[in-house]
Amino acid sequence: MAAHCNRVPVIDGHTACVSLEFDLPADKKPSLEEIEKIWTSFTALPQKLQLPSAPVQPIIVRHEENRPQPRRDRENDKGMAVTIGRLRSCPVFDIRFVALSHNTKRGAALGGILNAELLKAQGFFDNL
């Protein structure tokens, strides 16, 4: 995997350009369609528990050539969803894509609240 973030003058939102290679034989590597299906159907424990701060859809896939963009996509699902776009085959690795998350919501404030909600739901505070 290779990834890089660029510092750009935006108010909120971190964008990562990711290239990755699967450690699988060529005939076992997922297609772009399979990868997108995995992303769009992904749910985790916060969604299963329907926690208040959890995004309904934690990963949103965009098909436009110029997305994701911080100004347009950072607030997806209250700022808690990760938006992925520009998924394509990579001549060096297997695939590449751009991912965007809201740094002050998903990455800090609401992310911390979601962690606390998850700990409470799992009974972490019951014996304190």
Task: List where the protein language model places each region.
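C-terminal substrate-binding/catalytic lobe of Rossmann-fold NAD(P)-dependent oxidoreductases
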Residues: 1-94
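Generic C-terminus detector
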Residues: 94-128
